[in-house]
Amino acid sequence: MMIPFKVKTFSFLLACACSTAGMAQVGNDSPVKQVKISGYVGTRITDCIEHRVKAQDVDHLVEPFRHQNEKSRWQSEFWGKWIQGAIASYRYNRDPELYQIIKDAAESLMATQLPNGYIGNYAPEYQLQQWDVWGRKYTSLGLIAWYDLSGDKKALEAACRVVDHLMTQVGPGKVDIVSTGNYIGMPSSSVLEPVMYLYNRTKENTGHRTKRIKRYIE
């Protein structure tokens, strides 16, 4: 579907932009499978994808996850934010080169997962502080988005393990999540978003993980 840009189509474009926020939801019954925007806005979108999304040094985003020595900063949010944008871009243009970039980015990130499930860059004694859980949220969202696009079960498993590990640290009898991080735990508590997405994707299973995620939500 080719959409020429006009002022009267602004509401349609806004709806398209907002629809990416629901990318991690299950199911899409829309008969529209792809939209192509032309004109000035279409050119700007293409330029953004070519010269910003595809040009990103992905290894630079992954590198912090290879070193668990952070105490306070938020580098761990960037990979998850970038890959969600890259996946939305791929859904728009179906560029096979971009797909490979995304695939490589996901596999590089998953390779940093520790045996206990942690994916992040905070030193063990500083985990749960500052922006650590916030970064885990974006990591999980990015892995889920890749799973939704590719069907790669390794990504879903990696995201589940991230949450599994977090639940060994927070919850009843452990650290109260609202006491972690900044702003009375609001950034940390937003990890509930990927937790709910994981529940939606694993609730048909009867294993311990699904029950633990359900209990965490409740």
Language model: regions and residue ranges:
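Bacterial N-terminal signal peptides that target proteins for export
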Residues: 1-11
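Glycan-recognition and catalytic cores of secretory/periplasmic carbohydrate-active enzymes
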Residues: 24-218
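Bacterial N-terminal signal peptides
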Residues: 11-19
